[in-house]
């Protein structure tokens, strides 16, 4: 399993219990048909982050949240819930989390819909693979 796949699986596992109580449907790809509120975890971009004998990757990934309404009250709660998640220390296939930090959030209204994004940087490593 790649670092990208391990990170996506770990984030999905952490986000689901944070967002489900708020009525948000979580997807790992843009759904063809889905009602709001919804959240879509994007594809991570990655780069090398390792040392001698250690395989490491630095990944950046964004969660896009969509809702409707006059004001983004529920969307703000969703962003707060996403900001508060943490990852398990060990992910799939031996990938270990060296760090997870939120790098930014954004919110905007287009027509009747509000869209927010939460972006993270993760550093993962493993030995002997």
Region roles according to the model:
Residues 1-29, 43-129:
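Charged, amphipathic alpha-helical segments and their flanking helix caps
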Residues 34-36, 112:
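Short acidic/glycine-enriched loop/turn segments that link adjacent beta-strands
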Residues 36-44:
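Charged, often glycine-rich, active-site loop that binds/positions anionic groups
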């Amino acid at each position: 399993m790649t670092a990208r796949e391990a990170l996506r699986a770990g984030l999905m596992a952490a986000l689901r219990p944070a967002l489900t109580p708020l009525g948000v449907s979580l997807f790992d790809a843009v759904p063809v048909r889905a009602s709001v509120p919804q959240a879509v975890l994007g594809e991570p971009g990655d780069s090398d982050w390792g040392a001698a004998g250690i395989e490491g990757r630095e990944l950046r990934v964004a969660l896009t949240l969509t809702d409707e309404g006059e004001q983004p009250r529920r969307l703000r709660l969703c962003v707060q819930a996403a900001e508060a998640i943490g990852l398990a220390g060990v992910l799939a296939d031996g990938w270990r989390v060296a760090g997870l930090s939120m790098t930014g959030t954004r919110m905007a209204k287009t027509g009747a819909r509000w869209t927010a994004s939460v972006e993270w940087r993760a550093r993962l490593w493993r030995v002997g693979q």
